């Protein structure tokens, strides 16, 4: 009888789940299959941990820890404390060469490179709105954009300039930031409380982060499909 009751409860939840929540769950499964994030059981924590990869966006209402590694990329963490939903993105601006990155400026929000950053921010915000968050209640924390050696130094700087300009223009409630600097970071985020933990790591330990970001940068397609973002009021 207990098994039957549990199964009925699951079916009931599915039948009466809103279309937007069902769409969000389907989207999350597609993104996990594409490698945008990975979920796993932490050996010393009862919660699931979710690692967001470069180019990924993840939002949840579950008791989970979201984490990532950041070199020149940036991450925005956002949450609605009343609805207990939150999420994280992980992105950089794609530049074809050093000349392009040198001549880009943060007010150029309509450029191809900026459109990619805008897309990453919009997906995160709209994902949370689809889960019941209110835009006026959303709070943000911004991380990353390290000035790494060589060409990547410019990329990190431009990523920081972009995310700060975007937050200013969109009037986002940014309550904390840890941007720039010369070292990569490891970032942990509790999406229900908004608490975040940052650890700076040495370059000898950051090879995997740099490799992931380089692979991501080479794979970026700057033509963002207009029908990939659903807007919620």
UniProtKB/Swiss-Prot annotation:
Domain of life: Bacteria
Cysteine-cysteine disulfides: none
GO molecular function (one): protein-glutamine glutaminase activity
EC class: hydrolase
Keyword line: Chemotaxis, Hydrolase
Pfam family, one: CheD
The protein's Enzyme Commission number: 3.5.1.44
Hydrolase among keywords: yes
Reaction catalysis annotation: L-glutaminyl-[protein] + H2O = L-glutamyl-[protein] + NH4(+)
Keyword Lipid biosynthesis: no
GO terms (BP aspect): chemotaxis
Record InterPro entries: CheD-like_sf, Chemorcpt_Glu_NH3ase_CheD, Cytotoxic_necrot_fac-like_cat
Coiled coil: none
HAMAP family: CheD
PANTHER family membership: CHEMORECEPTOR GLUTAMINE DEAMIDASE CHED-RELATED
UniProt family annotation: Belongs to the CheD family.
Record function comment: Probably deamidates glutamine residues to glutamate on methyl-accepting chemotaxis receptors (MCPs), playing an important role in chemotaxis.
Stated name of the protein: Probable chemoreceptor glutamine deamidase CheD
Organism, scientific name: Vibrio cholerae serotype O1 (strain ATCC 39315 / El Tor Inaba N16961)
Encoding gene (name): cheD
